[in-house]
C-alpha cells in the first residue's frame, strides 16, 4: 500500500517511548494500550470545574494545519490547553505559505520561536514523517492527518470508543464501510485493530473504492453491505471523499447510498447491541441515514469526547519521550 511506514523507528526514543506520533504501523500492542490507559485517566479532567492538569505547563504546542479540519484542530487545541500548554494555531490561508514560503521554511521559523511540539495536518502523504526526520528532529511531531496515509489519533480515539463500549477487542467483529481507498482513517483503524488483537476485521465498499492489496492488513473484504454487516459488533462508517477522487469511481452519491448507505434496515444485520461510529463530518443521506446517526446505536458524539482525552495522552507521552531522548543525546555527547 505505502512504503512510508518503513520509517516507524523514528517515532520511538532509545527507551521505546513515544517521541513522535506519525503512524500506528509497527507500534507495539503495549504502547497502544498505554495510550488508551492514559487517555482513560484523562477523561475525568473534562468533568472538573477547572479542566486543567499541569503536565505541559511552560511548553508551546503549535497546530499547523495545511488542511481544514474543525473537529481535529479544536480537539487538539483543547487537549493542549487542558495540559496547561501555550497553544498557537497557524492559519495557513493567511500565513506566509500563501505568499510562497515552503513547508520547510514555515516550520523552521516556528522552531526558531522555541516551539516544543508541532501538530501537523497536510494533504501530502508522508508530510509528518518528512518534518520529523528532516526539518525539526528536536521537536515532537504529531500527525494530525497526512494525505491518504495515516490519521493515528483518530485511529486511537476510535479504539478508545470501542474499548469503553465493548470492553476489549479479542472477541469482536468490526466492519469498516465506505470509501476505503481514500481514507487514512481506515488505514489507521485496520492497523490498530490488528495490533490490539481484534480477530475479525472487515472492509466493505464498492470495488472501485477498495485499495489494491488491502488484504495485507489481515482483513476480510466484502462488496455487499448486507453480507459484510452480518453479526458485527462495531460498524465504522467513512465519509465519501469526493475531493480526493479522480475519474468515474462512482456513478452518483445516490447510487452509493442505495448500495452502501447505512440505514436502520441494514443495521439489523449486525448484532442487536452493535455500535455505530463515524469520524465526521457526516454526510447524511450519503453514507448514513439520520435515524442511525442520531439513534440508540450511535456513539459518534462519544468519539468526539474521547478524542480530547486521546490527544491529551499522545501530547503528554510524546513530550515526555522527546525530553528523555534529548537528555540521552546530550549526556552521550559529553
Swiss-Prot record:
Top-level taxon of the source organism: Bacteria
Keywords: Pyrimidine biosynthesis, Transferase
Catalytic activity: carbamoyl phosphate + L-aspartate = N-carbamoyl-L-aspartate + phosphate + H(+)
GO cellular component: cytosol
Gene3D superfamilies: Aspartate/ornithine carbamoyltransferase
GO biological process, one term: amino acid metabolic process
Disulfide bridge map: none
A Pfam family reported for this protein in Swiss-Prot or TrEMBL: OTCace_N
HAMAP family noted in UniProt: Asp_carb_tr
Similarity comment: family membership: Belongs to the aspartate/ornithine carbamoyltransferase superfamily. ATCase family.
UniProt xrefs under PANTHER family: ASPARTATE CARBAMOYLTRANSFERASE (PTHR45753:SF6), ORNITHINE CARBAMOYLTRANSFERASE, MITOCHONDRIAL (PTHR45753)
Protein's recorded name: Aspartate carbamoyltransferase catalytic subunit
Naturally occurring in which organism (per UniProt): Pseudomonas syringae pv. syringae (strain B728a)
Gene behind the chain: pyrB
Amino acid at each position: 500500500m505505502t512504503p512510508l511506514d518503513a520509517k516507524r523507528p523514528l517515532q520511538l526514543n532509545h527507551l521505546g517511548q513515544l517521541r513522535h506520533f506519525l503512524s500506528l504501523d509497527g507500534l507495539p500492542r503495549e504502547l497502544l494500550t498505554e495510550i488508551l490507559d492514559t487517555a482513560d485517566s484523562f477523561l475525568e479532567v473534562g468533568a472538573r470545574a477547572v479542566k486543567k492538569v499541569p503536565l505541559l505547563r511552560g511548553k508551546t504546542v503549535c497546530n499547523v494545519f495545511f488542511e481544514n479540519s474543525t473537529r481535529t484542530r479544536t480537539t487538539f487545541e483543547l487537549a493542549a490547553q487542558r495540559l496547561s500548554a501555550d497553544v498557537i494555531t497557524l492559519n495557513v490561508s493567511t500565513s506566509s505559505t500563501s505568499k510562497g514560503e515552503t513547508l520547510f521554511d514555515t516550520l523552521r521559523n516556528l522552531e526558531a520561536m522555541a516551539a516544543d511540539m508541532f501538530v501537523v495536518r497536510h494533504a501530502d502523504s508522508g508530510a509528518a514523517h518528512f518534518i520529523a526526520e528532516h526539518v525539526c528532529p528536536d521537536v515532537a511531531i504529531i500527525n494530525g492527518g497526512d494525505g491518504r496515509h495515516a490519521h493515528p489519533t483518530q485511529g486511537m480515539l476510535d479504539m478508545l470508543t470501542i474499548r469503553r463500549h465493548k470492553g476489549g477487542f479479542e472477541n469482536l467483529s468490526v466492519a469498516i464501510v465506505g470509501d476505503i481507498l481514500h481514507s487514512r482513517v481506515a488505514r489507521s483503524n485496520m492497523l490498530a485493530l490488528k495490533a490490539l488483537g481484534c480477530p475479525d476485521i472487515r472492509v466493505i465498499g464498492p470495488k472501485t473504492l477498495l485499495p489494491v492489496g488491502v488484504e495485507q492488513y489481515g482483513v476480510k473484504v466484502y462488496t455487499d453491505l448486507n453480507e459484510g454487516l452480518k453479526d458485527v459488533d462495531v460498524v465504522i462508517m467513512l465519509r465519501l471523499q469526493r475531493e480526493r477522487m479522480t475519474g468515474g469511481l462512482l456513478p452518483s452519491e445516490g447510487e452509493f447510498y442505495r448500495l452502501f448507505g447505512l440505514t436502520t434496515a441494514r443495521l439489523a444485520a449486525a448484532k442487536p447491541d452493535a455500535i455505530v461510529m463515524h469520524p465526521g463530518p457526516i454526510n447524511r443521506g450519503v453514507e448514513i441515514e439520520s435515524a442511525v446517526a442520531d439513534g440508540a446505536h450511535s456513539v459518534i458524539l462519544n468519539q468526539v469526547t474521547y478524542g480530547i482525552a486521546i490527544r491529551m495522552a499522545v501530547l503528554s507521552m510524546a513530550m515526555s519521550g522527546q525530553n528523555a531522548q534529548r537528555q540521552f543525546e546530550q549526556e552521550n555527547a559529553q
